[in-house]
């Protein structure tokens, strides 16, 4: 198979949703249909046959939430599928936003009883800004929920995107009978008594008159709704879907796996192949460019706690990866050898010899890489556009509970901060270590992982909310620091102030009008 044919097989997408909408469940069902698992909840590596969990971190298992992005791969219907399962909790939005830079499409999962919720709305806005195609799966049809027509209206009114249903529910909750699949000309029957999953339409495009469904009042209602939508609703347009202007909507129940395989088949038919990415000087790097290029969108420590390792996740943008190849690390200008490289099935992994544009690979990292790094070969010498960063608002002082374990404490901080889920600052005057986060859960996960993974108990003292502003090195003066504006350095050694509030920042500006305060550090 040629490089072009291999690249065209790739379908790389993320699943986004509000917590508890069923994101992890649908991920596991997709993996089941892809042959990667034998039952929901257990994920199997392709070569080893060992089973693992897609929510692999202990704290995720205990709380039932995803707080890291898992990358999983399988083959289905002639396509190579890469799924990125993103954190649903809002405190981990930074990790999710970066992950969305590495995909070509998004699947938005919505709880039929709750409709569009806060986190879904936030994530959709990111996807929309990037112009990523969105496919919608309305979940939990086996439970009582909102009217399907109301849910479609909400997509347009709240998210501002036109929608087109690809199938339609026949009843809901305890009356759920199946899906009227007008896209494929059939009815998908929920828990059929005769074991037949599909009722195919006859030559007139209808359910055969002799079939019991024709006398079912829920089916009659579904027919009326569908006819109304087909006449008055939006028409399906592959062009508009790929442009991110129209979302195809599928209904189903991830828990019972109903409607999921039909969704997968249709999604793979219309989801886009790998797309180009822009460099910092606006040059579009096409997937078929023969030179290898990629960017690191995530670094994850301790995917295997036995080895205390760290993996840098790379989205391949162009060309082909070959094991042992030398690449340029653009940030440092140095060459690095990519010899120990893996692909993933949750925390299971296997060595990879080759990968192409659209694939996600994991590079073992001993401290060489940073989130946002660009790797290239040949004539490609520019970095890709920077990944989004979030300025934290909540802060804590942190120290080791046992001073004798300072080494493991420092290693834990270094590795967890490297992942980018929490920010590190050091007081310029006292040397105190301070952590910044978008939300409280990040601190809880940090504390938990320090204990579990690094055997280092920590003392964390809340500092409340702060406003971060960077300054230029030449403006740095220790005398400016006070309890209301703490002078510190970030993990890259850039100077900054942590202001107690807006009033403290205004007071500082009045006193030091020549000092430029920056929301982001700029060289």
Curated annotation (Swiss-Prot):
What Pfam families does the entry give? EF-G_D2 (PF22042), GTP_EFTU (PF00009), RF3_C (PF16658)
Pinpoint the tr-type G domain residues.
8-275
Q: Does the keyword Cell inner membrane apply?
A: no
Binding of GTP occurs at: 17-24, 85-89, 139-142
Its main subcellular localisation, reduced to a broad class, is cytoplasm
Q: Molecular function terms in GO for this entry?
A: GTP binding; GTPase activity; translation release factor activity, codon nonspecific; translation release factor activity, codon specific
Regarding protein family, the annotation reads: Belongs to the TRAFAC class translation factor GTPase superfamily. Classic translation factor GTPase family. PrfC subfamily.
Q: Which PANTHER family match?
A: PEPTIDE CHAIN RELEASE FACTOR RF3 (PTHR43556:SF2)
Name it.
Peptide chain release factor 3
**Which species is listed as the source?**
Lactococcus lactis subsp. lactis (strain IL1403)
What is the primary gene name for this protein?
prfC
């Amino acid at each position: 198979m040629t490089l072009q044919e291999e690249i065209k097989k790739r379908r790389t997408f993320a699943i986004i949703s509000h917590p508890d909408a069923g994101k992890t469940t649908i991920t596991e069902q997709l993996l089941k249909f892809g042959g990667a698992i034998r039952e929901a909840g257990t994920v199997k590596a392709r070569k080893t046959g060992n089973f693992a969990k897609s929510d692999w971190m202990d704290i995720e298992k205990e709380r039932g939430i995803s707080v890291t992005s898992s990358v999983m791969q399988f083959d289905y219907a002639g396509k190579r599928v890469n799924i990125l399962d993103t954190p649903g909790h809002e405190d981990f939005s930074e990790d999710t936003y970066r992950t969305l830079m590495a995909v070509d499409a998004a699947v938005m999962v919505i709880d039929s009883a709750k409709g569009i919720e806060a986190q879904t709305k936030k994530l959709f806005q990111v996807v929309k800004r990037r112009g990523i195609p969105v496919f919608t799966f309305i979940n939990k049809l086996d439970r009582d929920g909102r009217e399907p027509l109301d849910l479609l209206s909400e997509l347009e009114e709240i998210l501002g995107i036109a929608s087109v249903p690809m199938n339609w529910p026949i009843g809901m909750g305890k009356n759920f009978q199946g899906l009227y699949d007008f896209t494929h000309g059939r009815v998908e029957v929920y828990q059929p008594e005769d074991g037949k999953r599909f009722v195919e339409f006859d030559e007139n495009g209808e359910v055969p008159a002799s079939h019991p469904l024709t006398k079912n009042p829920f089916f009659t209602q579904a027919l009326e709704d569908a006819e109304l939508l087909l006449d008055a609703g939006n028409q399906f347009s592959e062009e508009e879907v790929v442009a991110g202007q129209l979302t195809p909507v599928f209904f189903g129940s991830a828990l019972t796996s109903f409607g999921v395989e039909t969704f997968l088949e249709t999604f793979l038919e219309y989801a886009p192949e790998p797309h180009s990415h822009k460099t910092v000087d606006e040059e579009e790097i096409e997937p078929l460019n023969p030179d290898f290029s990629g960017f690191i969108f995530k670094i994850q420590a301790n995917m295997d706690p036995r080895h205390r390792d760290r993996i840098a996740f790379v989205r391949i943008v162009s060309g082909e990866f070959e094991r042992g190849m030398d690449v340029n690390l653009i940030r440092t200008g140095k060459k690095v050898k990519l010899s120990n490289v893996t692909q993933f099935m949750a925390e299971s992994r296997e060595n990879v010899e080759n990968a192409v544009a659209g694939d996600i690979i994991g590079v073992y990292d001993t401290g060489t890489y940073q989130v946002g790094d660009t790797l290239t070969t040949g004539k490609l010498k520019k970095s890709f556009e920077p990944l989004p960063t979030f300025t934290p608002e909540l802060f804590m002082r942190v120290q080791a509970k046992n001073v004798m374990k300072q080494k493991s404490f420092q290693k834990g901080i270094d590795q967890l901060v490297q992942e980018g889920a929490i920010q590190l600052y050091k007081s310029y005057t006292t040397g105190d270590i301070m952590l910044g986060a978008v939300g409280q859960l990040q601190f809880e996960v940090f504390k938990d992982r320090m204990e579990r993974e690094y055997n280092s108990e920590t003392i964390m003292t809340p500092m409340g909310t702060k406003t971060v502003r960077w300054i230029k090195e030449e403006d740095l003066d220790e005398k400016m620091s006070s309890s209301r504006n703490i002078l510190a350095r970030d993990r890259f050694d850039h100077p900054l102030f942590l202001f107690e509030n807006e009033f403290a920042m205004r007071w500082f500006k009045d006193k030091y009008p020549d000092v430029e305060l920056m929301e982001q550090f700029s060289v």
